[in-house]
UniProtKB/Swiss-Prot annotation:
Its cofactor is FAD. NADP(+) binds at residues 217, 237, 294, 330-331, 360-361, 370-374, 399-400, 438. This is Ferredoxin--NADP reductase. It comes from Nostoc sp. (strain PCC 7120 / SAG 25.82 / UTEX 2576). Residues 122-133 have a biased composition (Basic and acidic residues). PROSITE patterns: CPCD_LIKE, FAD_FR. Belongs to the ferredoxin--NADP reductase type 1 family. Residues 17-75 form the CpcD-like domain. Residues 155-279 form the FAD-binding FR-type domain. The gene is petH. It catalyses: 2 reduced [2Fe-2S]-[ferredoxin] + NADP(+) + H(+) = 2 oxidized [2Fe-2S]-[ferredoxin] + NADPH.
Length: 440
């Protein structure tokens, strides 16, 4: 859907303001039509700087990728933000945006300062939230000053070595998903739970240029799978789809590279990046996790930090005492990634961890259709709503973007029973830093 009214207004600004900034929401990758167009997708708004002579073309591209333009401003109008917004400069659309693979992350884009990375939030701002009765309150958004970001950049990546590459999908499952562990010895690649790293695959793209990096959610805690501060792990699905014109099977460049990589191979790694999905420091926090497929990666890091014996021993300052609930959507039982780990935690900590599966090709929803994660959320919406109202509760959503609408609908129904408008309440949760989303 094009925003023609916004375009007409932008065209009549003062002479000399010939570069505009689009604020776009909902931008996504469409597997049927846009696999080769390098779309971007990250939670929240995307800000794209567009020359006047490319405005119409860029609008069409945004619409094709499922995006919605919510505002158009001149660059000078945004200078008041003082670096709080990440802006992608559009020259050739495909050259500035990297293809999303794996768990759907997008390459960081250039900011006005020329540095690559994610937008920096203000140090602290007073934000509205709701108490248990739905009343408006305020709280200061949490600071993340000590979070490591961009320790290694694309022009000088860290060279890691593959230690192991293990299959996660059991016999009879669908697709290829691998758990890949890298050796970080000799470097200074520090990270924390909820962040991502970039992988630069070898070779060149269709234009003969070096392949761009792809971002993947980290699947290990800050101490690594061996709890020795020497490794980092990823959970990667091989991207596979049918070309919309030829019908041929096409495989993702970076995901195929990673899922088939041999132990001992060297890999170019950048980052870490990201502050959207960080786990709260409060050991008494409640954590709701809604994940599909490889969206389990950050959830695994949270659960290991909370419950694994070696992790608890390594983190005496963080002994989780809250309540966590994972709702995990997969197509078949063999596709339940890290199944043994998850169920071991559930058995050992039944009062602190609840595990719920939505297995779409094996279970039915109340209407007789497939049981997707949004159906499970609807089934438990009243319980989830009561938990979300607790000011210590953080909610994390990672995986397929399609689940968001159903999740919102379910929670809207639950909130409406108490006279609360979910969309308004959700905005307050986001401002308070208690609603975290990474979908694709």
């Amino acid at each position: 859907m094009s925003n023609q009214g916004a375009f007409d207004g932008a065209a009549n600004v003062e002479s000399g303001s010939r570069v505009f900034v689009y604020e776009v929401v909902g931008m996504r990758q469409n597997e049927e039509t846009d696999q080769t167009n390098y779309p971007i997708r990250k939670s929240g708004s995307v800000f794209i700087r567009v020359p006047y002579n490319r405005m119409n073309q860029e609008m069409q591209r945004i619409t094709r990728l499922g995006g919605k333009i919510v505002s158009i401003q001149t660059v000078s109008a945004l200078q008041q933000l003082n670096g709080r917004t990440t802006i992608a400069t559009v020259t050739d659309a495909s050259s500035e945006i990297a293809k999303s693979e794996g768990n759907g992350k997008a390459t960081p884009v250039k900011t006005d300062s020329g540095a690559k990375g994610f937008a920096k939030p203000p140090a602290e701002e007073q934000l509205k939230k709701k108490d248990n009765k739905g009343n408006t309150m305020t709280q200061a958004k949490a600071k993340h000053a000590d979070v490591p970001v961009n320790l290694y950049r694309p022009n000088a990546p860290f060279i890691g070595k593959v230690i192991s590459n293990e299959p996660l999908v059991k016999e009879g499952g669908i697709g290829i998903v691998q758990h890949i562990k890298f050796d970080l010895t000799g470097g200074n690649l520090k990270y924390i739970e909820g962040q991502s790293i970039g992988i630069i695959p070898p070779g060149v793209d269709k234009n003969g240029k070096p392949e761009k990096l792809r971002l993947y959610s980290i699947a290990s805690t800050r101490h690594g799978d061996d709890v020795d501060d020497k490794t980092i792990s990823l959970c990667v699905r091989q991207l596979e789809y049918k070309h919309p014109e030829s019908g041929e099977t096409v495989y993702g460049v970076c995901s195929t590279y990673l899922t088939h990589i041999e132990p001992g191979s060297e890999v170019k790694i950048t980052g870490p990046v990201g502050k959207e999905m960080l786990l709260p420091d409060d050991p008494e926090a409640n954590v709701i996790m809604l994940a599909t497929g490889t969206g389990i990666a950050p959830m695994r890091t949270y659960l290991w930090r909370m419950f694994k014996d070696a992790e608890r021993a390594a983190n005496p300052e963080y002994q989780f005492k809250g309540f966590s609930w994972l709702v995990f959507g997969v197509p078949t039982t063999p596709n339940i990634l890290y199944k043994e780990e998850l169920e071991e935690i559930q058995q050992k900590y039944p009062d602190n961890f609840r595990l719920t599966y939505a297995i779409s090709r094996e279970q039915k929803n109340p209407q007789g259709g497939r049981m997707y994660i949004q159906d499970r959320v609807a089934e438990h919406a009243d319980e989830l709503w009561q938990l979300i109202k607790n000011e210590k509760t953080h909610t994390y959503i990672c995986g397929l973007r399609g689940m968001e609408e159903g999740i919102d609908a379910a929670l809207s129904a639950a909130a409406a029973k108490e006279g609360v408008t979910w969309s308004d309440y959700q905005k307050d949760l986001k401002k308070a830093g208690r609603w975290h989303v990474e979908t694709y």
